[in-house]
């Protein structure tokens, strides 16, 4: 086991605070509409230019072991805030730095760190309660666009695209972000259920100009096994042919004689069919097939329920108004499933989301809910270069998360004003002793810091602006984008309540831990191996021999 080094008391805290400051100073330059860029070096490929606080934080590793511990703790603030609310990472970092900086002064002066922490916790709880009181629900598309615009560092086109996407697919719908193929941002909305499997043979295509196989008013056969023998399919094919409607077959695979026969019948115009593989794998495939069955009013033909292909009838087949099958995707539009059954299925999946332990499982379950309840919107981010698209994509992701947070918990005036307004509730608090009162005063000072940083990044005098905003009431604040004072909600400077709340709670949590730390244990630095003297054979210096 490697030797460890231990540092105690003020020496440990001072080093930790240095690490906090190094990371926070790099992150906080990105805050606000006039925040600056940070360039991140990459081992491979071109550098990344970003205004995304959490992207900057994640890149930072310090050479000094103890400083690095401090930096990693603040990095945790940014990551936790990003995970919970999707935005507010820079605000959380600024708040954490301010609480640590102010708290360190009191600890150095001999105050009890535990009482300081109790005072900090009491003040934060009061601030959160007050935030909830001043929060108002997000109701209009305009407010959603404003929240998204602020989170995207003031880019209105991103805000409009996100608001439009939510309008089209609803609050439950899936919105994904992809690289675009042009300079402009685009919105592509898929109505109905789409899954990532395409036709098994290009001979199924009947719209060559769009490279699609399109079926109007089709039956849908869902099977959880491979189909290779055409004899298994014949009974159901005959029934579909008599009904005079096309057929979509979704199975684990369709191959050999079965696929060849379907292709020949399709080319000759005897029976219009398309075969696709079932989406997903294992248990997830079964669940997705069941989703499609419920959405289309059909049943999955599976031995588990006693159904076989030979005995399948039209009653077991699903129906839809239209199906479009491309090379890589299949889209079912307007399935014939009963709404109560679909709602029950959505409720069941939501219960699974609540119990899911991994982010991946949760994300996939949410996708299934969206496909059943709403639709899927794809925002394609455009740009002139790969670096520009990557930077813009980060901002679109932030804006998307912020918008969802706003829909969830409502909005408060942005630009750091909400944190100034909650100071009144904290100022009235009484601590159990002088040290707790000092903890409360730490939070009172820290709550000004996001506004101070936004103003400083805009090149203005922070103290003057903070005093002017504090003298105002309600939504009155400073719009750093225009350099004017006024009603921030009216001018569209909004923050999701969840983002502001999460940033404050996470910052206070980690800052409290840092202030109550009295020792650090870290790996001792390794001594560098001595350099080989020049002239030694094989050492690579002058006079080496072969």
Swiss-Prot record:
Substrates-to-products reaction catalysed: ATP + H2O + a folded polypeptide = ADP + phosphate + an unfolded polypeptide
Statement: the UniProt record of this protein carries the keyword Glycosyltransferase: no
UniProt feature, compositional bias: Gly residues: 537-546
SUPFAM superfamilies reported in the protein's UniProt record: GroEL apical domain-like, GroEL equatorial domain-like, GroEL-intermediate domain like
Gene Ontology CC terms, in alphabetical order: cytoplasm
Keyword Nucleotide-binding part of the UniProt annotation: yes
Assembly behavior: Forms a cylinder of 14 subunits composed of two heptameric rings stacked back-to-back. Interacts with the co-chaperonin GroES.
Protein known as: Chaperonin GroEL 2
Organism of this sequence: Burkholderia pseudomallei (strain K96243)
Protein encoded by which gene: groEL2
């Amino acid at each position: 086991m490697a030797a460890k080094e231990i540092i105690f008391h003020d020496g440990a805290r001072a080093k930790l605070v240095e690490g906090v400051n190094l990371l926070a100073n790099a992150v906080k330059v990105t805050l606000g509409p006039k925040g600056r860029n940070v360039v991140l070096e990459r081992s491979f490929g071109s550098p990344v230019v970003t205004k995304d606080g959490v992207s900057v934080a994640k890149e930072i590793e310090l050479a000094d072991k103890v400083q690095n511990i401090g930096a990693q703790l603040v990095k945790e603030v940014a990551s936790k805030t990003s995970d919970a609310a999707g935005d507010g990472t820079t605000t959380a970092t600024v708040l954490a730095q301010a609480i640590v900086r102010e708290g360190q002064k009191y600890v150095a002066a001999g105050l009890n760190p535990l009482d300081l922490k109790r005072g900090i916790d009491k003040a934060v709880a009061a601030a959160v309660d007050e935030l909830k009181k001043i929060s108002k629900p997000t109701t209009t598309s305009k407010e959603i666009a404003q929240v998204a615009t602020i989170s995207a560092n003031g880019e209105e086109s991103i805000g409009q695209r996100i608001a439009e996407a939510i309008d089209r697919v609803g609050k439950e719908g899936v919105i994904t972000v992809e690289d675009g193929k042009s300079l402009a941002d685009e919105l592509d909305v898929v109505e109905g259920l789409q899954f990532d499997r395409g036709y098994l043979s290009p001979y199924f295509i009947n719209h060559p100009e769009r490279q699609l196989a399109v079926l109007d008013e089709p039956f849908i056969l869902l099977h959880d096994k491979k189909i290779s023998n055409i004899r298994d399919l014949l009974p159901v094919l005959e029934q579909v042919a008599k009904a005079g409607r096309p057929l979509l077959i979704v199975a684990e695979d369709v191959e050999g004689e079965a696929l060849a026969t379907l292709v020949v019948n399709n080319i000759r115009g005897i029976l219009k069919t398309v075969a696709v593989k079932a989406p997903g794998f294992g248990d997830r495939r079964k669940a997705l097939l069941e989703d499609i069955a419920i959405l289309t009013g059909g049943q999955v033909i599976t031995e588990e329920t006693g159904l076989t292909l030979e005995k399948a009838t039209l009653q077991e087949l699903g129906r839809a108004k239209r199906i479009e099958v491309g090379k890589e995707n299949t889209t079912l539009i307007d399935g014939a499933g009963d709404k109560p059954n679909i709602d029950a299925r959505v409720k069941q999946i939501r219960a699974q989301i609540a119990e899911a332990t991994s982010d991946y499982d949760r994300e996939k379950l949410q996708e299934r809910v969206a496909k059943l309840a709403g639709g899927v919107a794809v925002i394609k981010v455009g740009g002139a270069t790969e670096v520009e698209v990557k930077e813009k994509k980060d901002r679109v992701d932030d804006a998307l998360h912020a918008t969802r947070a706003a829909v969830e918990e409502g909005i408060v005036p942005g630009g750091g004003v909400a944190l100034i307004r909650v100071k009144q509730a904290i100022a009235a608090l009484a601590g159990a002793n002088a040290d707790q009162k000092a903890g409360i005063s730490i939070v009172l000072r820290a709550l000004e810091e996001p506004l101070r940083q936004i103003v400083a990044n805009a090149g203005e005098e922070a103290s003057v602006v903070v005093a002017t905003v504090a003298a105002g009431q309600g939504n009155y604040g400073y719009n750093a984008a225009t350099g004017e004072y006024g009603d921030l909600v009216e001018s569209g400077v909004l923050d999701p309540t969840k983002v502001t709340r999460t940033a404050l709670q996470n910052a206070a949590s980690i800052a409290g831990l840092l202030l109550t730390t009295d020792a650090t244990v870290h790996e001792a630095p390794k001594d560098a191996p001595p350099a080989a003297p020049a002239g030694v054979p094989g050492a690579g210096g002058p006079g080496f021999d072969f």
